[in-house]
């Protein structure tokens, strides 16, 4: 029996307490043990916080697949600045996509290698296209696109 002094209502799939829905999850005990170990390692206060983050992440990732959703992210790549014309190519790409590139940070890693981190914003399909173009450039040793949400729909 639930005893709350706050407003309680029924919700499809669980009990709703002022905008929060309580529901049950069934899983194997081994999986739950692994989950509990991970949420402790990640410093979550409880399972609910971890599950909310997992659900948000799942929603955000699926929004990218729509391709028309406004998104924000980073393109991080390591490149050898001694590869012929790479600096010019990367700069040209940045100017070509200036409407989507908010900021770029450039760091010298050693005598030969640099890392750049770009903050990008736009439709998911545009961001993926820019990342693919940069990461596939000759001289780029490794690159990664990380997209997230603008937060509007969460």
Curated annotation (Swiss-Prot):
Superkingdom of this protein's organism: Bacteria
MF terms in GO: DNA binding; DNA-binding transcription factor activity; nickel cation binding
CDD domains on file: RHH_NikR_HicB-like (cd22231)
Family: Belongs to the transcriptional regulatory CopG/NikR family.
Positions contributing to Ni(2+) binding: 95, 106, 108, 114
Cofactor(s) needed by this chain: Ni(2+)
Organism lineage: Bacteria, Bacillati, Bacillota, Clostridia, Thermoanaerobacterales
One Pfam family this sequence matches: NikR_C
GO BP term, pick one: response to nickel cation
UniProt function note: Transcriptional regulator.
NCBIfam families found in the cross-reference section: PRK00630.1, PRK01002.1, PRK02967.1, PRK04460.1
Species name: Caldanaerobacter subterraneus subsp. tengcongensis (strain DSM 15242 / JCM 11007 / NBRC 100824 / MB4) (Thermoanaerobacter tengcongensis)
Keyword Transcription: yes
Cofactor: how bound: Binds 1 nickel ion per subunit.
Alphabetical list of Gene3D superfamilies matching this protein: ACT-like. Chain A, domain 2 (3.30.70.1150), Met repressor-like (1.10.1220.10)
Protein name: Putative nickel-responsive regulator
InterPro entries assigned: Acetolactate_synth/TF_NikR_C (IPR027271), ACT-like_dom_sf (IPR045865), Arc_rbn_hlx_hlx (IPR013321), CopG (IPR002145), CopG/NikR_regulator (IPR050192), Ni_resp_reg_NikR (IPR022988), Ribbon_hlx_hlx (IPR010985), TF_NikR_Ni-bd_C (IPR014864)
Alphabetically ordered keywords of this record: DNA-binding, Metal-binding, Nickel, Transcription, Transcription regulation
């Amino acid at each position: 029996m639930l005893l709350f002094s706050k407003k309680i209502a029924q919700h499809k799939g669980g009990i709703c307490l002022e905008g929060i829905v309580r529901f049950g999850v069934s899983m194997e005990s081994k999986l739950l043990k692994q989950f509990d170990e991970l949420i402790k390692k990640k410093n979550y206060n409880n399972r609910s916080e971890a599950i909310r983050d997992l659900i948000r992440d799942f929603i955000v990732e699926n929004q990218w697949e729509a391709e028309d959703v406004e998104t924000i992210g980073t393109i991080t790549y390591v490149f050898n600045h001694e590869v012929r014309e790479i600096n010019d190519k990367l700069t040209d790409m940045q100017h070509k996509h200036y409407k989507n590139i908010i900021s770029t940070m450039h760091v010298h890693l050693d005598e030969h290698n640099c890392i750049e981190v770009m903050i990008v914003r736009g439709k998911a399909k545009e961001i993926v296209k820019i990342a693919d173009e940069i990461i596939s450039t000759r001289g780029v040793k490794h690159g990664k696109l990380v997209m997230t949400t603008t937060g509007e729909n969460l």
